[in-house]
């Protein structure tokens, strides 16, 4: 039951933060786990303003006066830093047809606030990233490679074939121009092309 309540708390906070980035959310009496190895800190008040944690204090006593904003009761619940899934493929041909409608909100509901897409359709992912930033789509922060680079006979249809050093440099330049955050390489790239890419 506590897991369900935590998911509801995280989803509610994410929805509130995305629906109006100028709003303030105050989570009171929550147990904070900061993931540094320090013991859990019970009875904390966390203030989130414009999508960022502004302050954490025990019982809100250090804030002085009445706190204004959307109040969330964290009694019996835990608050942790957002998690990252460092290897996902959200748009990969027709393998994951419901990524936008199902997968993105499920990431957030399960505490995943950031993902690294390791090979997918760059333009689709960029559109999702814009919608998430605008608050019209619930989902995690996305960093993406776009199509993977592979050797002369790629294993996946969406991969970019690299035969020569020139192919490699051209592919990297093109992905950079199109907005890729990083480049993912597969294992079939010829040695000379690999060094040109590096």
For every predicted segment, state its role.
Residues 77-136, 152-156, 160-166, 192:
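Metal-associated gating/positioning segment near the N- to mid-region
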Residues 30, 46, 51, 76, ...:
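Divalent metal-coordination and catalytic microenvironments
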Residues 36-80:
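Histidine-rich, glycine-flanked metal-binding segment
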Residues 63-64, 132-140:
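Short helix-capping segments at alpha-helix termini
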Residues 4-15:
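Bacterial N-terminal signal peptides
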Residues 151-198:
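Active-site gating/metal-coordination segments in enzymes
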Residues 103-123, 140-147, 176-188, 198:
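Divalent metal-dependent hydrolysis catalytic cores, especially in the metallo-beta-lactamase
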Residues 17-22:
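Boundary at the C-terminal end of the N-terminal hydrophobic targeting segment
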């Amino acid at each position: 039951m506590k897991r369900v309540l935590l998911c509801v708390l995280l989803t509610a906070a994410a929805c509130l933060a995305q629906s109006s980035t100028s709003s303030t959310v105050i989570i009171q009496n929550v147990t904070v786990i900061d993931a540094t190895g320090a013991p859990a800190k019970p009875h904390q008040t966390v203030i989130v303003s414009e999508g960022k944690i502004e302050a954490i204090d025990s019982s809100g006593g250090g804030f002085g006066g009445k706190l204004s904003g959307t109040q969330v009761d964290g009694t019996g619940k835990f608050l942790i830093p957002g998690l990252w899934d460092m290897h996902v493929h959200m748009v990969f041909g027709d393998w994951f047809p419901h990524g936008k409608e199902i997968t993105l909100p499920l990431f957030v509901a399960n505490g995943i606030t950031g993902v690294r897409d390791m090979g997918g359709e760059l333009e689709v992912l960029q559109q999702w990233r814009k919608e998430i930033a605008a608050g019209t789509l619930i989902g995690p922060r996305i960093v993406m490679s776009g199509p993977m680079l592979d050797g002369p006979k790629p294993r996946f249809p969406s991969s970019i074939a690299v035969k020569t050093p020139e192919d490699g440099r051209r592919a990297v330049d093109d992905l950079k121009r199109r907005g890729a955050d990083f480049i993912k390489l597969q294992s079939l790239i010829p040695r000379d092309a690999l060094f040109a890419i590096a």
